[in-house]
Amino acid sequence: HFYKLNLSKNLPPNLIASLLPGIPLTNIGEAMKPAAMAATLVEHLWKDAQSPFYSMINTPLYRGGVISLNSIKKPIEELIKDSNNFIGMNTSSAGIIDKELILKDIYNYWEAASKVFSHAWNIRSTESRLMHGVGLWAMFMLMPKVIEKCHDEHPGVEEIITHLGLIAPYCHWTAEDGDWENVDSFGLNITWNGFENTASGKTLISKYINRTYRDVIRDATL
């Protein structure tokens, strides 16, 4: 009951996220299960040497990363709320999920992203919006759509690279990439670091990236 009792104590979100993986899902209410599952997955992402995010995520125990713990946990939590986003989310009554399948998709997708956007990878979020909460959110929201369009149910890195490569010319994660262009229906342009990690900022960039992917994949021959 530690987690429930301390929600009202204003503990730092990153500390709460780091505590959740140690709590069995059977001891957590339904409303909190997405957060607990996401925290468990994120723990694998920063601890596993095979993960594309290995040693890149800051936690209360490790401060050498470039990504905020909450910035990566929140989009995963959002995806988990809809079981259609992950094949491995067919849960049993005991709340058991196929962690390995979910991690496989996350690993492959983000390994591909690290190759396609190598210039924006593993650098401070002040230098790369891809490592910022708003960029992580947008790319995680795109992930189910990319996987759905791939030939394999659990696509490999190379196939995902082909898909992400289609949107690469339209993504402006760093200063060298220039401004984001025609972000909305009014032709809005935004500086490379102009998207804020707010609800409106995340919605705007997510809609832009999803719309761009929809348009380029429609005309692509893969």
Q: Can you name each region flagged by the protein language model?
A:
Residues H1-L222:
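Accessory terminal alpha-helical modules
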